[in-house]
Amino acid sequence: MKQPAKIDVAVLMLFFNRPDNFQKVFDEVKKARPAQLFLYQDGARGERDVPGIEACRQIASDENIDWECKVHRSYQTKNQGCDPSEYLSQKWAFSIVDKCIVLEDDDVPSQSFFPFCKEMLDRYEHDERIAMIAGFNEDEVTPDCEDSYFFTSVFSIWGWASWRRVVDKWEGDYAFLRDKQAMRQLESVVRQRGLRKDFIPMCRDHAHSGKEFYESIFWASMLLNSSLAIMPCRNLINNLGLSDDSTHFSGSMKTTPKAYRRIFTMKRHELEFPLKHPKYVVENVDFKERVYKINAWGHPFIKMSRSLEELFLNLRFGNFSSIFKAMARRWRKTIGRDKHA
């Protein structure tokens, strides 16, 4: 006999061919026992992917979903790639439910993450100022935070939740790039906030590719709608780290600059309930400035020092292939063939 669902919320899980990682994330979802589960898996690139794909499907099989849960599956027969798979999977889930939690196969949540997202999804469901709930906090524990969470314009997609009303605003065709007035305003916002200078060129490249890159689509939508994210005062997500088969990162932990290495070794915490709610919806600017510094956005000297640190670490550990690849990327950027290196 199956256990009853513990929390009335939907969870979308994106996975591919990494059963060891996926098992860790699935185990936490299994403890939380959400009422609905969306399972999205991309198709194989070739025969080498098949064993991992089948192992992941076994983890998420009906026999392993031992609680009462409405299960939706979208298993692709052809390989779509990371993009547009993430965009397609999220549009699929949010076409069925009004609000949902999203976890990729390297985002391990604390148990507090689920009731936190559920409460935020219900509380701010109709507040157009709020576009998403984040789980990953780059502070780990935000100082001088008297409430359970705060508001910010900078966020991570390592474990998040949102609403259909937000996803419906996503412009998968990058239509905003053809709106001259919107682009003037967006360029001013990017410049005034000190955001990455290649953001708009990146959006143009993504649009030209004919694929939907949900991160640039989501970020542009947040900026164009002056939206805020909800950030827990304590970090609720572990990312499983750097590896050659990571979705968004590759490389070695030992050759990663210390400031970035900290992000991948950060602890996840639990929140205390009942939650303490902020009285006002106002951005935590101090947090934003710390995140900018961590990521070297608008800090050219920090960015340069990180590059030198990475070069030193690669030399120290004899990782010459990474050095040559970095040099090649820098050369392509110099001659205009790689704008985002």
Question: What kind of region is each of these model predictions?
Answer:
Residues 1-102, 107-341:
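An acidic/histidine-cluster motif and surrounding catalytic segment
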